[in-house]
Swiss-Prot record:
Annotated coiled-coil segments of the chain: 1093-1201, 1364-1401
Statement: the UniProt record of this protein carries the keyword Cell membrane: no
Annotated tissue distribution: Predominantly expressed in the germline (at protein level).
Record-given protein name: Histone-lysine N-methyltransferase set-9
Natural source organism: Caenorhabditis elegans
Function in brief: Histone methyltransferase. Might play a role in transcriptional regulation. Together with set-26, negatively regulates lifespan in a germline-independent, partially daf-16-dependent fashion. Together with set-26, plays a role in germline development and maintenance and might play a role in the restriction of the trimethylation mark on histone H3 'Lys-4'(H3K4me3) to target genes specifically in the germline.
Length: 1623
């Protein structure tokens, strides 16, 4: 053991502290020892011999043969000591146990009781052992063999597991020398019997010398007294006990008492006259006594039959000093029997210092009952003095090398593969022990100290020998310096094997490694010396047997030679001595018995059969020679397989199979029993072996060769050929063929029941089929099954399913199940009462249909097979593939049993892979030699347990079930639920493409499995899953052992590769009760915690995102609701505004209607009318004038668009906003600012002339004469222009635009006006667009651009804007003009009054009637009548044709200005009285003009000459206008010579019309400029109506001359010469 360890065994015995007593005088005085306790045995051989020749060493075989031992009793009262040596037991007193004290190191420093250090001579004497003393420790817990087993195999135990836990408790059986023999130990570890051998008692024996000394009566020498003493702790307080290294000693390890001893003190140890016990080592050498106790703690003892003076001291005193002789020659102490020592401290004289180990201590037996098992004793460990020591086995193995095979073969890098191949060529084959009882030995090799002068030569460890002393008599011994070490070969072999399992249960190394030839076991050299031993002698290379080259690494020649040697290799005897070196066996030891070898299964054959799937290549023959060679090898392999299969009862006749019961045709095949695996059937090769194991209850079946042949089946169908046996239909005698169903669902295969022997109808003999499929069916038929179905039939054809509760079978169709149904936990209707979807009658009819189909298929198969049988002639099997018939090369049915079901994806994957060489043979062997079966390992816990010894790399069982891909099955990660995941089919190596996991294969053993479904997982597995690919894409997944597995051992597999992803606890077979101790479970829990934390983090992030999304949606919903509420509010406001507008409009229409009715009633009806011809002529003239005006407008628009810049337009728009009237719309409704601004004249409505007195005056200079106060009367012409008002509806069509007569051109005054800003049509377009948006949208939000609003403008636009000082000056001028206009209005009223009086005069018949009045004119006339001027004026004289009425200067000036301003005025809307006038077309206008109208009397005052006017189409109000409000194209001027005649109403007759030449519009337009300026004398035509003017101009005919112009007066000429602000 290592330094510092103080282990106490479970059965340690402590002694209570005895009461302080006075030392008895009978005790001999102790001998003072001058050395520290336990310093080793003297090296001098004479001391050892002197010990053996001492007279006190009398053999104790006669005394101890029939002696019993008892516990020490409680100290009674003093008794009389008898005079004869009689052993008397005392009453048992149980001791008081106290806690042991940590013992100090018993080397390097003296004990606390030793005050004097040892001298140099004493130290040398203490370190003087005998040369031939070698102590072997074969049962130490720290031996290297156990470490190797743990490192290579990861075994939780070693072969020393059943020994006592402490080395002191182990008994070494004597094999040579005069040892005291023992008969054994009882159940309480007590020595049953002990004696000395007969040859040990002789003339020169220690016993003889003892008798001689006893007869002489001489006392014992001081040196021999110490050899008799045994180191024995007294009964005292352990806390005060001295630090000793010796173990308590008593005879046989029992506490004894002797007669005559003091009753107050128990006798401990050995006295001179008592029964002596010879202390010697394994080789018969005596050992000196060491480590005596101080006297103050030593017990007292009475010598028997001896005087006090003859007693010798047993223990030395701490303070006293002995004699020089005692100090110079200390007495060696003999160890107890069975003790062992280390070889320590190599000294110059050769040999070593043996350090005494603790002896075994047996428990004493009681007379009255069993021994007390609670008694314990302290165990003290003896430490060597030299710490520089190295322990290793005699045949040590090297340290566990770098295990390349820990990596799975398909995950190895190319460098690892190369290193593994190199290791496979260099290492030796494993060596197995010859006998289980032989164990490895351990020696201590000590480094030589620097001060040592020489060293004993160490034998070479390669020879695997031990330094041992021969068996000799004591008298024949020679001095040590003359002795020569004898080399004897060892008697044992060190078992060094390897495994494929992971040495340390790390999570990263427990993936299922693949068993291929790329990862063979590593063998360590059995005779290799430890590398850490300095000055090691060169060793001979060990004799090893290299492992044969794997098949996938063989060349073609090596393969041929290997298969050829298979037969001869099997005939050789296989024993452990054949593989061991010949020089390792000792000559005098008989050879050990050979180990148990499974004869049908050979290790070399396994190596030949198992081939790596990853390295295998197709063996396609290229030449006829290759084909012949391959055929021979195949035949040789088949015969070799038949050799050992024939031992089980096969014969040559059994290798012929008959097709359909006929012997005419035979086929050569391999005799391998293919049986149907089922989880209910028993193993086939059950053999009864004498054993008392717990799993041997079911091993009573007969061997295979002794079993009678089972009765053959009465019929055979395709399912039985395909290894899917079915039952026999009820009531049928003909062969039935069942259609093979798809096994993709939950249906299970129902094994056939044992049936009676049926006679064949063809030959009258027993129907026998010798092929492998039928044999497998017959073997499976041994099991009986029960069919209890809903339909009432008991046949087993079709898809059936087994109830998990009562283990009965039902038809799936009768239970309402399909192949796709989930039947993992199916129970019948009896175990789980429920209502079935199929009634009994329907189920019976369905089964009848199934049976009919089976019968029809059987008849069809029979008809197909009969002609083939007649053509067969040969019945002898062919020995060559070339000579075989063609039918054998292309068999109709596969010969390999398909014991598995495959999904579509799995089948596609397997068909694309290459076949493994020898796979069919290996699969047949695994099915034939099953080495495990299901058993109960615990209560209600079944597992797979081995039924035979399984060697490493042997196949135990084949896993059968439903093979599918991992993506097709729902499984539990890590393994479980009878589903095994296999990753051996994955492609690629480490560092390459490992695939996407689609090649992970899962085998579901619940559907079609065998006993492998009960295999459990473990963190220290002893098996793995491997695979081979046979013919017809048959995947064989097998359980292969990774170490030697003994019988009755549970088979465990590693966890699946995805065990970390499991959410439930792993079911570890090693830690079922303490799962937290499993490293895999701990790792899985850590991964699960990390995975849960990641999932919680993701959930938290998702929750935060969800909350943020909900908050965003909530805010959007709030904004949406606010917008909807605002929109609704605005819609309601707009609706209210529109309703208010409609109500106001309706009210206005009612008022207008009333006014029109009143005016119509007040106006006199006109009797005069014009003819249709005259009306047509007027219409043609007006049409011509309209066209001319339109052409002029287009030209003017083009000219303005070219000349007007954007800056001017914006300035004009700004000015228009400033000059726009505020009360343009009479309806009181809110409107945006853009609707209140004044824009282009194309869309800007005219302002109403009926403004309230509180309104500010209009800023537009062109409208200041048009907007008079409401209280003042206006003339006819002004009222016509002022009646246009703004309408709420914006007109977008061009036909709704109305222009005045002078809109197409400019007067000279307008042309000369520089301060008038041009019309801004850009603003009109913007307003038009805004109005369109307002009309189409529900929310009226019109926002003008920034450059239109009142924001800051750029410098260019600011420079182009008009000067506000000039605007204010213009406003003042307009106010002055308004005052002047009021005065003129007063004068005009007098003229109108005159005209009214003129209308009242009677008209003549030939005089044309007045022009018709419009409704508006009538209405205004009524107003003028009501409103009389303030100052009455004198009515003017009546105008006549010769004397036209003259106007004053102010009146003419105002009228001229008004005409100038209104020349470019555009009227696009109806009058104010009519909010929405009715629009008419030109056709309606012509139809209205064609109607007869009465000529009305001219009631308008004379006005200035203006251009011609084309009536608008926008209503009746503007059509029937007076002539005075229309500028004419031609008027009398200074260039016209024709006089103008005005027919006054007072003239009695109409004048004769004169011829008037009608000028063209161009001629009239040339003269209008002067006429428009010279308006001093108003012509008479302006006071006429339209008809009067037509008659005056044209007369009754077309040639009517125009009236002459009025004469010019001085006032007129002077007025024209006066400059005005428009000139």
């Amino acid at each position: 053991m290592a330094d510092g360890e103080h282990t106490l065994p479970a059965d340690e015995e402590l002694f209570e502290q005895p009461p302080p007593q006075q030392q008895q005088p009978e005790i001999a005085e102790p001998i003072v020892m001058a050395q520290e306790p336990i310093q080793g045995v003297s090296e001098d051989p004479q001391a050892s011999e002197a010990t053996h020749e001492a007279p006190d060493n009398y053999p104790v075989d006669h005394q101890m043969e029939n002696q019993e031992f008892y516990h020490e009793p409680q100290i009674p009262e003093p008794q009389q000591i008898p005079q004869i040596p009689v052993f008397q037991p005392a009453a048992y007193n149980p001791p008081n146990y106290v806690a042991p004290q940590q013992r100090a190191n018993n080397f390097g420093e003296p004990a606390a009781a030793d005050a004097r250090p040892l001298t140099e001579q004493e130290q040398l004497a203490a370190e003087r052992p005998t040369e031939d003393t070698v102590w072997i420790d074969s049962d130490d817990d720290t031996d290297v063999e156990e470490a190797i087993l743990r490192a290579n195999f990861w075994l939780p135990y070693s072969d020393h597991n059943y020994d006592p836990p402490d080395p002191a408790d182990r008994i070494i059986l004597p094999t040579e020398g005069p040892f005291p023999c023992i008969a054994g130990l009882d159940e309480d570890c007590n020595i049953v019997k002990q004696w000395m051998p007969e040859d040990a008692v002789g003339p020169g024996s220690p016993g003889t010398q003892y008798r001689r000394n006893q007869q002489a009566g001489g006392g014992l020498p001081s040196t021999s007294v110490a050899s008799q003493q045994q180191q024995l702790p007294v009964r005292h307080n352990i806390q005060n006990r001295p630090m000793v290294a010796a173990q308590p000693f008593s005879i046989g390890g029992n506490q004894v008492e002797y007669g005559g001893m003091d009753s107050r003190m128990q006798q401990r140890g050995v006295v001179r006259d008592g029964p002596q016990y010879r202390v010697m080592n394994d080789f018969g050498n005596g050992l000196p006594m060491r480590g005596l106790l101080p006297p103050r703690n030593s017990p007292a003892a009475n010598a028997i039959n001896r005087a006090r003076e003859q007693q010798q001291q047993m223990y030395h005193q701490a303070g006293a000093r002995g004699s020089l002789q005692q100090r110079a020659a200390p007495a060696p102490a003999d160890p107890t029997p069975g003790s062992y020592q280390h070889i320590v401290n190599a000294v110059p004289g050769g040999g070593a210092n043996p350090m005494r180990r603790v002896p075994p201590q047996a428990r004493p037996g009681m007379i009255g009952g069993a021994a007390n098992n609670n008694r314990a004793r302290p165990t003290h460990v003896t430490r060597p003095m030299d710490t520089q020591e190295f322990e290793h086995p005699v045949a040590p193995a090297a340290a566990p090398p770098h295990r390349v095979v820990d990596v799975a073969p398909h995950r190895m890098t190319p460098e690892q593969r190369q290193e593994l191949q190199q290791m496979n060529r260099q290492r030796a084959a494993p060596q197995f022990p010859a006998a289980a009882a032989q164990r490895s030995a351990e020696v201590i090799v000590i480094q030589q100290r620097p001060g040592a002068s020489s060293r004993a030569p160490r034998p070479s460890m390669a020879q695997e020998d031990l330094l041992r002393s021969p068996t000799r008599r004591l008298s024949e011994r020679v001095p040590q310096e003359h002795q020569t070490p004898v080399l004897e070969p060892r008697r044992f072999q060190v078992k060094v094997t390897d495994t494929y399992s992971t040495p340390i249960p790390k999570a990263s190394d427990q993936l299922p490694a693949q068993l291929t030839e790329e990862d063979p076991p590593e063998e360590s050299a059995a005779a290799a010396a430890p590398e850490d031993v300095p000055d090691a002698a060169p060793e001979d290379p060990p004799k090893v047997i290299l492992k044969p080259t794997p098949p996938h690494r063989m060349t073609q020649e090596e393969k041929n030679a290997h298969f050829a040697r298979l037969t001869t290799d099997k005939e050789k005897p296989t024993s452990s001595t054949s593989i061991l070196p010949q020089d390792a066996a000792p000559p005098h030891v008989p050879p050990p018995p050979p180990p148990l070898v499974l004869r049908p299964h050979h290790q070399d054959e396994t190596l030949a059969m198992v081939q790596s799937v990853f390295e295998s290549k197709p063996r396609q023959p290229d030449t006829p020679k290759d084909k012949e060679t391959i055929s021979k090898i195949a035949d040789l392999l088949r015969f070799s397989a038949d050799e050992f299969t024939g031992q089980s009862g096969s014969s040559a006749a059994a290798r012929q199979r008959t097709v359909s019961g006929s012997a005419a045709r035979a086929q050569t095949y391999q005799m391998h029993h293919q049986q149907q695996q089922h989880h209910h059937q028993m193993p086939m090769d059950q053999r009864k072996r004498p054993s008392s194991g717990r799993y041997d209850a079911l091993m009573g079946a007969m061997p295979l060769q002794q079993q009678p042949p089972p009765p053959p089946s009465q019929f055979q169908h395709t399912d039985s050929i395909a290894h899917r046996p079915r039952g026999r239909p009820k009531g049928t005698r003909h062969p039935s063929v069942a259609v093979q169903p798809q096994r993709s669902g939950g249906a299970r295969t129902l094994p056939p029941r044992a049936q009676t022997v049926a006679m064949s109808a063809r030959n009258g003999a027993n129907a026998k089929n010798s092929d492998s499929e039928s044999e497998g069916i017959d073997e499976a038929a041994e099991e009986s099954w029960t069919m209890r179905c809903h339909c009432g039939m008991d046949h087993g054809d079709g898809d059936t399913i087994e109830c998990e509760g009562c283990k009965t079978w039902q038809h799936m169709a009768c239970m309402g199940l399909t192949l796709k149904s989930n039947t993992s936990k199916y129970k019948c209707e009896m175990c789980l009462p429920r209502r079935l979807p199929v009634s009994k009658a329907e189920a019976a009819r369905e089964q009848e249909r199934i049976l009919n189909r089976l019968r029809a298929a059987a008849r069809k198969q029979k008809r197909k097979s009969e002609p083939v049988e007649q053509k067969q002639k040969s019945s002898q099997p062919s020995t060559s593939r070339k000579s075989a018939p063609m039918a054998l090369q292309q068999p109709a049915e596969p010969r390999v049993a398909q014991l598995n079901d495959y999904s579509k994806q799995a089948s596609a994957l397997l068909f694309g892979m290459e076949q493994t060489a020898g796979a069919d043979t290996l699969l047949a062997e695994s099915r034939l030699h099953k080495k495990a079966r299901r058993m109960f390992v615990e209560e209600a816990v079944e597992a797979l347990v081995t039924t035979d010894l399984v060697q490493i790399r042997q196949v135990i069982l084949e896993v059968n079930g439903h093979v599918s891909m991992s993506s097709e099955v729902k499984r539990q990660p890590g393994g479980g639920n009878c589903i095994f995941m296999y990753d051996g089919l994955m492609k690629g190596t480490a560092g390459e493409d490992m695939g996407d996991g689609q090649e992970l294969v899962c085998i579901d053993t619940k559907r079609k499995g065998n006993d492998t479904k009960f295999t459990r997982r473990s963190c220290v597995p002893n098996c793995v899953l491997k695979h081979v690919l046979g013919s017809n894409a048959t995947l064989g997944i097998m359980i292969v052992a990774t170490k030697d597995i003994t019988r009755n051992t549970e088979v465990t597999l590693p966890f699946d590769a995805d065990w970390r992803e499991s959410e439930v606890e792993l079911e570890c077979a090693e830690h079922m009760k303490e799962l937290q101790a499993c490293p895999f479970e701990s790792e899985r829990r850590r991964f699960a915690a990390e995975r849960h934390r990641a999932m919680d983090h993701k959930k938290q992030e998702a929750e935060e995102a969800r909350r943020a999304d909900e908050e965003r949606r909530r805010l959007e919903e709030e904004v949406r609701r606010e917008r909807a509420a605002k929109t609704k509010q605005m819609d309601e406001a707009e609706k209210a505004r529109l309703e208010a507008e409609k109500a106001a409009e309706k009210e206005k229409k009612a008022k207008e209607r009333k006014k029109m009715e009143a005016s119509a009633a007040a106006a006199p009806e006109s009797t005069n009318s014009i003819t249709a011809r005259e009306e047509r002529r007027i219409q043609q003239a007006e049409e011509m004038f309209r066209r001319q005006e339109e052409e002029g407008k287009r030209k003017e628009a083009r000219r303005r668009s070219k000349s007007v810049t954007p800056g001017v337009l914006e300035a004009a728009g700004t000015a228009a906003r400033e000059d726009a009237p505020e009360a343009s719309i009479p309806v009181p409704a809110p409107s945006p600012p853009a609707s209140r601004r004044s824009v282009s004249r194309t869309t800007q409505p005219s302002t109403s002339s009926f403004a309230t007195p509180t309104e500010p005056p209009a800023k537009n200079k062109r409208m200041r004469s048009v907007v008079p106060p409401k209280s003042e009367p206006a003339s006819s012409a002004k009222r016509v222009r002022a009646t246009t008002v703004a309408t709420p509806k914006a007109t977008t069509a061009n036909d709704s635009r109305k222009r005045t007569a002078s809109a197409t051109g400019k007067t000279p005054v307008a042309k000369r006006s520089k301060n008038v800003a041009p019309t801004s049509f850009a603003l009109a377009l913007i307003e038009k667009e805004l109005r369109e948006q307002a009309r189409n949208s529900t929310v009226l939000e019109m926002i003008l651009p920034d450059y239109i609003m009142n924001e800051e403008r750029s410098g260019l636009l600011a420079g182009q804007s008009p000067d506000f000082s000039e605007v204010r000056a213009q406003i003042e001028e307009e106010n002055r003009m308004k005052e002047r206009s009021r005065k003129r209005e007063a004068k005009k009223k007098a003229v109108e009054k005159e005209k009214k009086e003129h209308r009242k005069e009677p008209k003549k018949t030939n005089e044309p009637g007045p022009a018709p009045k419009s409704e508006k004119a009538v209405e205004k006339a009524v107003e003028k009548v009501e409103k009389k001027p303030k100052s009455p004026q004198k009515p003017p004289a009546k105008p006549t044709a010769q004397n036209p009425p003259l106007k004053k200067t102010e009146e003419v000036d105002g009228i001229e200005r008004e005409a100038s301003e209104s020349s470019s005025k555009e009227s696009s809307v109806a009058p104010e009285e009519k909010k929405n006038p009715k629009k008419i077309t030109f056709a309606e206008y012509n139809s209205r003009r064609s109607q007869k109208r009465e000529a009305g009397e001219c009631s308008t005052p004379p006005a200035v000459t203006r251009r011609g006017f084309i009536p608008s189409t926008e209503g009746e109000d503007l059509v029937n206008v007076e002539l005075s409000a229309i500028p004419l194209d031609d008027h009398p001027s200074s260039s016209n010579t024709a006089p103008t005649t005005t027919i006054a109403p007072s003239v009695g007759g109409a004048p004769k019309p004169t011829s008037v030449v009608v000028k063209s519009p161009s001629t009239r337009s040339r003269t209008r400029g002067a006429a428009s300026e010279s308006a001093d004398d108003a012509p008479a035509e302006h006071s006429m109506s339209l008809q009067d003017r037509v008659f005056s101009m044209f007369g009754s005919t077309v040639d009517a001359p125009a009236p002459p112009p009025p004469p010019a007066s001085a006032e007129t000429n002077s007025r024209r010469s006066r400059s005005t602000r428009w000139n």
